[in-house]
């Protein structure tokens, strides 16, 4: 859930439709009259995750698109609220994106993306940290990962960390996840 101008919204990332196709509409609902009302559908491709965040008073929705058809190398989408609805702000290249997490360090907004695997369906890939730079997100850092399934950031004793969970290395599921310290 997120709030825009004292209105409560909720967004859902939809993975596939009743025909099991992953070119689907993910949905945004607004609280009105004691219940949520659908206000917008947004094109996504096997959306696995959605996060809302703000930059300088502007509200954004980011969707982690897992796959388009049989292709795991597909863009994920960042939408921006225009005062009435969400418009596509930017497409970012991802590889089987399973999760994303916006975070702020020293006033700079970043978006971490956990990539599961690319079109070769190999678990070794790179997850990406994007940085908001002017009117777009740019790649700040690529992190080697194996089937990354989630990503988050947290602060501890004045330091910022990025945690990336790993689902599998392609041979076993008892794997090590990674913790990175911001330098």
What name fits each language-model region?
Residues 1-6, 51-57, 101-107, 152-158:
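Structural signature of eukaryotic scaffold interfaces centered on beta-propeller domains
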Residues 15-20, 66-71, 116-121, 167-172:
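Short glycine/acidic-enriched loop and turn motifs that connect beta-strands
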Residues 24-31, 75-81, 126-132, 177-183:
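Beta-propeller blade signature
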Residues 32-38, 84-88, 134-139:
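Beta-strand initiation motifs
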Residues 41-51, 91-101, 142-152:
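Repeat-based blade/solenoid architectures
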Residues 97-116, 120-123, 127:
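Loop/turn-rich, solvent-exposed surfaces of beta-rich toroidal or solenoidal domains
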Residues 126, 145, 149-183:
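Blade-level signature of beta-propeller repeat domains, shared across WD40, Kelch, NHL, RCC1
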């Amino acid at each position: 859930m997120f709030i825009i101008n004292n209105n409560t919204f909720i967004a859902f990332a939809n993975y596939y439709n009743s025909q099991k196709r992953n070119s689907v509409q993910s949905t945004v609902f607004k609280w009105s009259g004691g219940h949520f009302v659908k206000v917008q559908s947004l094109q996504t491709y096997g959306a696995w995750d959605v996060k809302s965040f703000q930059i300088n008073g502007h509200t954004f929705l980011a969707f982690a698109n897992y796959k388009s058809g049989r292709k795991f190398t597909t863009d994920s989408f960042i939408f921006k609220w225009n005062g009435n609805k969400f418009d596509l702000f930017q497409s970012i290249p991802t590889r089987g994106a399973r999760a994303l997490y916006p975070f702020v360090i020293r006033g700079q907004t970043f978006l971490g993306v956990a990539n599961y695997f690319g079109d070769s369906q190999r678990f070794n890939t790179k997850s990406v940290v994007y940085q908001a730079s002017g009117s777009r997100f740019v790649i700040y850092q690529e992190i080697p990962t194996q089937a990354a399934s989630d990503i988050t950031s947290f602060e501890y004793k004045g330091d910022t960390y990025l945690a990336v969970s790993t689902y599998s290395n392609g041979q076993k599921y008892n794997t090590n996840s990674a913790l990175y310290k911001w330098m």
